[in-house]
Amino acid sequence: EEKLKEYSVDILHAKKWLTALIHIEAENAEGPNALQKELIPISVRQIAEDHLRDYCRFTIFNSSAGITLIAAIDENNSQTGLLDHLGDICKECRRVLEVTVTIAVGHSCQKLSELSRMYQSAVDALGYRSIVGVGQTIYINDVEPVSRGKLKFDNADENDFVTAVKFGPEEKIRETIH
């Protein structure tokens, strides 16, 4: 929090935060020349900033996974509204810049200390673009079930389960599960 204050990043004191990754898809077509390709990320970032400026408080920066967005959700906006704005950004980048942009949105968090985990969920959401498609918003809650806890086995139980699934009849599988 001190660093956010020090650098005047205005996302503190929100109800929750969302992280998103803006990924510019590689184009195989005869597109812009090399100089124009270098300018595309700057233009995409500018479009995102213009769309979100009047909607929510946010910070946007470059990271190893792409253009990263952290948005503050409070009483003046909503998570659903933000997802709609992100979808509009994808459409406008396609229309204006003629580039395909996919925006992956991670889980929301209510504590800033959870941002790194939420960022990882946005990276995970980006991994679904080959299944869901590109040029749109991919929200992690839409593609992954909400975790209810992990199934835990000890080594013996795990071996019994794997053996039953691989080699056993249906009755053996049911017996092993129960």
Question: How would you label these PLM feature ranges?
Answer:
Residues 1-178:
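Hydrophobic, helix-rich cores of sensory/ligand-binding and other regulatory modules
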